[in-house]
Amino acid sequence: MSTNLRKTHPLAKIINSSFIDLPSPSNISAWWNFGSLLGACLILQTITGIFLAMHYSPDISLAFSSVAHITRDVQYGWLIRNMHANGASLFFMCIYLHIGRGIYYGSYLYKETWNTGTTLLLLMMATAFVGYVLPWGQMSFWGATVITNLLSAVPYIGNTLVQWIWGGFSVDNATLTRFFTFHFLLPFTIMGLTMVHLLFLHETGSNNPTGLNSNTDKIPFHPYFSYKDLLGLILMLAFLLTLTLFSPNLLGDPDNFTPANPLSTPPHIKPEWYFLFAYXILRSIPNKLGGVLALMLSILVLFMMPILHTSKQRTAQFRPLTQILFWLLIANLLVLTWIGGQPVENPFITIGQMASILHFSILLILMPIAGAIENKMLT
């Protein structure tokens, strides 16, 4: 009897134990599809990004026109560029749904997997930010100026830090060059950390909607979940292509069709939609340092999720109070996203402040209390 090469070859057996014979819970729903979709997004973004880098010039006198050249003169350049830009939006849609699933079903109790995942989110945000600067349009330039300027709020070393990042006394050629370097480098760091994320996940196996131990009922990943993931992938690509081919500039900013001009500030400086919730939290605090800390904490609060879990049950599936708070959190994040795109005037300022307070209250205070109350209700 010959042994199966898939199970003996040093490389093949790693792939086999990760994607073929991997024991998976039989009851994981479509909410567990987003991990593979994020992997697909990463591959797509890397491929389109490399092709764009072949034609892009990271110099302030050439950047804007090189992007115009890509969309006009390069074979399918318009498609590659629009897929890359909208692929970033899709990437964030998937990661936000993936994190939402993690919070709802208590996946954060796999601490190592959760912490590597949160670090991946931070790296992704950094990559998207430096990437947005590269076309060197008005919003690219002013977005870079405003966000890097936030570091000047750091006590004592703030101004030095900002000038160090800029490579001069303003956002200039040196800034664009280093941002291009980071935008090229970070995705490969993300790939490496993704492998660590998977390694930690496969130490414990997947969680499932009930939150109960699923060791008694496991099925092989292939063919069951490989085909389920394939369906998700087809739907995601259909959505991406529809967005790219019918409305490629829907999520972009019209100001970015104007070349960067340090002498003219756009009336409303705002980031891409996927950063608006954090931007609204930043703006809702009148103090600069306070705003920067709140901005950081709005993401870093995810690292605290495992510590703040008080319930005897893992998932929110059978916890009505936590369910109410979870959906309130989602609604509140949508409100913050809307506020982030509005001008700084009443009533938007007040709404933003209320929503910011609620964001932290739900995660840090109300959810742990709800967990404790639900424990009492069980006894």
UniProtKB/Swiss-Prot annotation:
Supply the InterPro entries for this chain: Cyt_b/b6_C, Cyt_b/b6_C_sf, Cyt_b/b6_N, Cytb/b6-like_sf, Cytochrome_b, Cytochrome_b_C_euk/bac, Cytochrome_b_N_euk/bac, Di-haem_cyt_TM
Residues binding heme b b566: H98, H197
Per its record, how is this protein called by name? Cytochrome b
* GO MF annotation list: metal ion binding; ubiquinol-cytochrome-c reductase activity
Task: Describe its assembly.
Answer: The cytochrome bc1 complex contains 3 respiratory subunits (MT-CYB, CYC1 and UQCRFS1), 2 core proteins (UQCRC1 and UQCRC2) and probably 6 low-molecular weight proteins.
**What parts of the sequence cross the membrane?**
34-54, 78-99, 114-134, 179-199, 227-247, 289-309, 321-341, 348-368
Give the record's membrane topology.
Answer: Multi-pass membrane protein
UniProt organism field: Emys orbicularis
* Function field: Component of the ubiquinol-cytochrome c reductase complex (complex III or cytochrome b-c1 complex) that is part of the mitochondrial respiratory chain. The b-c1 complex mediates electron transfer from ubiquinol to cytochrome c. Contributes to the generation of a proton gradient across the mitochondrial membrane that is then used for ATP synthesis.
Q: What else is known?
A: Heme 1 (or BL or b562) is low-potential and absorbs at about 562 nm, and heme 2 (or BH or b566) is high-potential and absorbs at about 566 nm.
